């Protein structure tokens, strides 16, 4: 596949660089590079980035106001550039080595052309596109599950509060169990200690049962079931209402299972490994193919091409685990506070906890 893109006129190349090859010009070099890599760049950008960011999501860990396009070019926080800076430095080093050793290995009859890199670049672009799409699908599924958690708990509390009109204590108890479930799920997904949040939220009679269980989320669902059974035995909830409330509790269990599935089922390692190796081999050898035509421009062009591939590969790796603490993962703390505010507002429990706000670097945990 070839894309006919216009080549704008360029200034002539500095005269001192013409000593490498007679008749060499920057316009000729730009035409050669665009011809070799237009498929790589266009396919990677159009497929990987478009599929990666086609659906907007709220409450990302990087929350930025609208910025001018020029200022966005220099954004550091939230970019994967900080993660790949060392790797790009190695690419610049390989480019310098390629420039310095060009005449030596050229005299040995070693000729590395751009043709194999053009073919390999297409393959890498396809794999990166599917890799980023798979990672973003996991991110979207995780965000959908937490959105479903908020909707289900609001519906659940509304059903209970409208049924138990004169029993505020029972309503507060089930609300506390739901809020404890959210924070416990957050700690389970991030593998952190949730004892402080459980002690803050749990009703006293459920402390020992939940705190001593290796899976607090499962135990909290069981406590909700016990609570619902108690209300049914008291005769304050009819069978029809009981079935409706139990269905919402079952949906909370489905949310838990969906989050556990994402955490325990990563993208197959062999798939990630072959892409990782291919990208790094491509970026390592690329300067030796560019130097014959670009010479001193080799480091600049090589690091730009490498940035495109390495950043997409790094972003896919980051989005693969949407519950982590990376810059572009889900802000589970903020989501838990949002749900807690909603539940407390429904039962009239004021003042509400303050919503979390991004820090000076626009990070929202």
Model-found features: residue ranges?
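Structured inter-helical modules in multipass membrane proteins
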Residues: 159-269
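Short, C-terminally biased terminal segments at protein or domain edges
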Residues: 1-49
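Alpha-helical transmembrane anchor segments
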Residues: 95-96, 100-106, 115-117, 127-131, ...
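Solvent-exposed, non-transmembrane helices and loops of integral membrane proteins
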Residues: 153-182, 188, 323-365
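Short helix-terminus and kink motifs of transmembrane alpha helices
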Residues: 130-138, 143, 147, 218, ...
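Intracellular alpha-helical coupling/juxtamembrane segments of multi-pass membrane proteins
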Residues: 139-156, 248-256, 262, 326-329, ...
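N-terminal juxtamembrane/topogenic regions of multi-pass membrane proteins
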Residues: 53-147, 166, 294-296, 341, ...
């Amino acid at each position: 596949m070839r894309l006919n893109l216009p080549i704008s006129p360029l200034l002539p190349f500095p005269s001192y660089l013409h000593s490498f090859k007679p008749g060499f010009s920057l316009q000729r070099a730009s035409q050669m590079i665009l011809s070799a890599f237009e498929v790589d760049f266009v396919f990677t950008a159009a497929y990987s980035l478009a599929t990666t960011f086609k659906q907007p999501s709220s409450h990302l860990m990087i929350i930025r106001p609208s910025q001018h396009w020029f200022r966005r070019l220099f954004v550091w926080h939230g970019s994967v550039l900080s993660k790949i800076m060392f790797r790009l430095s190695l690419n610049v080093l390989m480019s310098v080595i390629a420039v310095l050793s060009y005449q030596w290995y050229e005299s040995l009859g070693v000729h590395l052309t751009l043709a194999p890199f053009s073919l390999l670049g297409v393959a890498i672009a396809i794999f990166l596109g599917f890799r980023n799409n798979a990672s973003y699908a996991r991110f979207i599924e995780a965000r959908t599950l937490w959105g479903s958690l908020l909707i289900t708990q609001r519906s659940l509390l509304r059903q209970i509060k409208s049924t138990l009109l004169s029993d505020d204590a029972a309503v507060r108890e089930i609300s506390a169990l739901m809020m404890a479930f959210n924070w416990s799920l957050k700690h389970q997904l991030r593998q952190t200690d949730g004892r402080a949040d459980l002690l803050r939220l749990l009703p006293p009679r459920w402390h020992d049962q939940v705190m001593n269980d290796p899976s607090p989320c499962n135990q909290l669902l069981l406590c909700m079931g016990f609570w619902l059974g108690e209300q049914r035995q008291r005769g304050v909830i009819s069978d029809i209402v009981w079935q409706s409330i139990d269905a919402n509790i079952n949906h909370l269990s489905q949310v838990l299972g969906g989050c556990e599935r994402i955490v325990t089922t990563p993208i197959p390692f062999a798939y990630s490994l072959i892409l990782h190796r291919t990208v790094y081999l491509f970026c390592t050898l690329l300067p030796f193919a560019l130097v014959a035509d670009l010479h001193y421009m080799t480091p600049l062009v090589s690091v730009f091409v490498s940035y495109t591939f390495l950043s997409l590969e790094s972003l896919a790796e980051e989005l693969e685990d949407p519950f982590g603490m990376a810059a572009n993962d889900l802000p589970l703390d903020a989501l838990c506070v949002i749900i807690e505010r909603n539940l407390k507002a429904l039962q009239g429990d004021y003042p509400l906890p303050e919503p979390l706000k991004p820090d000076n670097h626009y990070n929202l945990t």
